[in-house]
C-alpha cells in the first residue's frame, strides 16, 4: 500500500481482529500523542526541538492551527501498568493519552522556542495533507477503569524531553 500511515492502520486492524477473535486476555490501547526522550525524529515534538536548535532566525510550523493534547511517556507507562495489573480490565478497547492542555502547533512551537531560550521567530506554514485539525482522545472509558492523576504537565515533560535531545543528538548551533 502506498497510502501514508498504512502500516500503522493495518497494525491497528490486525490488533483489533486478534482482540475480537481470540480468547487471549487482551487490552486494546489506542495510543494518542505520547512524547518524551528517545522517541525518534518522526514526531512533531522532537522535530520542533531539533529544528529550533538548528535555527538562527525562525522556526517553521506546519498545520499551525491544528490542536493536540500530549501525554508524557512516564504517565503513559504508569497508566499502562495500572491497566495490565487490574484483573477487571480485559477485552477492553481504551484510549491512552491526555485530554488536558490542548495546544495548537504554533503555540507548541513558541513554547519549545521559549524553553530553549532561543530568540527566533515562529512562522506558521500550510497544513499537512491528511492531518486532523484536532486530536484529543476521549478518556471516559479509561477513567471508569482506573483512577489516575497525571504527574507531568506539558511544560515539565517538554523540559525533560528537550534536555534529553540536547544531550543525545548532534545539532548545529
Task: Give names to the regions the model predicted.
Residues 9, 13, 17-82, 109-113:
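NAD(P)-dependent short-chain dehydrogenase/reductase
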Amino acid at each position: 500500500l502506498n497510502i501514508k500511515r498504512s502500516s500503522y492502520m493495518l497494525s491497528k486492524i490486525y490488533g483489533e481482529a486478534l482482540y475480537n477473535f481470540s480468547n487471549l486476555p487482551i487490552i486494546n490501547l489506542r495510543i494518542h500523542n505520547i512524547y518524551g526522550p528517545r522517541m525518534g525524529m518522526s514526531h512533531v515534538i522532537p522535530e520542533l526541538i531539533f529544528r529550533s536548535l538548528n535555527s538562527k532566525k525562525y522556526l517553521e510550523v506546519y498545520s499551525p492551527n491544528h490542536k493536540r493534547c500530549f501525554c508524557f511517556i512516564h504517565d503513559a507507562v504508569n497508566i499502562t501498568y495500572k491497566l495490565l495489573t487490574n484483573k477487571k480490565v480485559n477485552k477492553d478497547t481504551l484510549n491512552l493519552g491526555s485530554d488536558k492542555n490542548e495546544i495548537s502547533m504554533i503555540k507548541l512551537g513558541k513554547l519549545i522556542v521559549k524553553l530553549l531560550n532561543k530568540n527566533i521567530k515562529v512562522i506558521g506554514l500550510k497544513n499537512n495533507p491528511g492531518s486532523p485539525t484536532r486530536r484529543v482522545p476521549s478518556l471516559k472509558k479509561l477513567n471508569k477503569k482506573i483512577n489516575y492523576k497525571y504527574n507531568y504537565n506539558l511544560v515539565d515533560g517538554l523540559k525533560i524531553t528537550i534536555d534529553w535531545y540536547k544531550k543525545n543528538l548532534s545539532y548545529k548551533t
